[in-house]
Amino acid sequence: MTASVSYSTIGRIGTILVDSPPVNALSHSVRQGLVDALNAAATDETDITILRCEGRTFIAGADISEFGKPPQEPSLATVLDALESFPKPILAAIHGTALGGGLELALCCDYRLAIETAKVGLPEVNLGLLPGAGGTQ
């Protein structure tokens, strides 16, 4: 895992925690941490994994500081593939905003639980852009 993503267990429940202020953007560090945490969770004795985030947002999408730079693996598509093929149920605990790639990530989880004030969306479509990982498919 990375400093931005941690994995812990309590009993038979695993928790992947994203903590990458200010908005938990999907930076290379977060993407790598998610893949590492999913790999750890897949092989332990837990029955379910919860994906949650610290701070005021769930995940607010791409890290704009990485725009214009060469892409680095794991890509968002790689992370989403890891979620979709995860062998145990995974629940996204959504608060704040889940935008763009953050919403796509939540949609790849088996279950989504959102607080009443949570907001989700694909703002890139308002600019005539397709979501980066196929969120409209």
Report residues per predicted region.
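Glycine-rich beta-to-alpha active-site loop
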Residues: 83-132
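A short, glycine- and basic residue-enriched loop/turn
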Residues: 23, 56, 61, 117-119
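Hydrophobic/aromatic residues within transmembrane alpha-helices
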Residues: 16, 51, 63, 105-106
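Conserved CoA-thioester-binding segment of acyl-CoA-metabolizing enzymes
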Residues: 1-54, 81
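Glycine- (often His-adjacent) and acidic-residue-rich active-site loop
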Residues: 33, 52-82, 98, 126-129
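Hydrophobic, secondary-structure "cap" segments at the distal end of domains
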Residues: 136-137
